[in-house]
Amino acid sequence: MLREAGTPCVFWGDLFGTPETSDLPAVTELPLLMTMRRALAHGPQHDALDDPDVVGFAREGDEAHPGSGLAVVLSDRRAATKRLHVGARHAGEQWICVLGGHEPVTIGDDGNVELPVSDGGLSVYAPEAARPILDSAEQHLLRQR
């Protein structure tokens, strides 16, 4: 959904659930991730695939989309941190874990940051400055419920 390559396909059942045909609920975070794709997933991508159990990638953002940029860390086993390059343009910024569960982090002067992820978890980070965009997506989600 948030990577540079490809075009994501969102299925009706993922967005709204399919109670008539299965017990699969809607993916509640999907509207937020869709908003992040549109507003924040821009610019060069940097992959961190040096550990088979903890991977990540970051999008630097670009000048055409003020406040853009994001980072994603996934773990299939243990809690960990992943060092990612989000771009020197973000030096000194506070980034937040939009899915919750982790404290804000500060981007280093070189554009690098250590991002935590929980056991078997997914962490998605965005600039604190993007909070109005993210809050708007959350409000839309609450109205849909």
Question: Language-model segments: which ranges?
Answer:
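Acidic carboxylate-rich catalytic motifs and surrounding loops in phosphoryl-/glycosyl-chemistry enzymes
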Residues: 11-18, 44-53
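Short, solvent-exposed loop/turn segments at secondary-structure junctions
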Residues: 15-18, 62, 76-79, 130-131
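Carbohydrate-binding surface patches
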Residues: 49-89
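Solvent-exposed beta-hairpin/edge-strand motifs
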Residues: 87-102
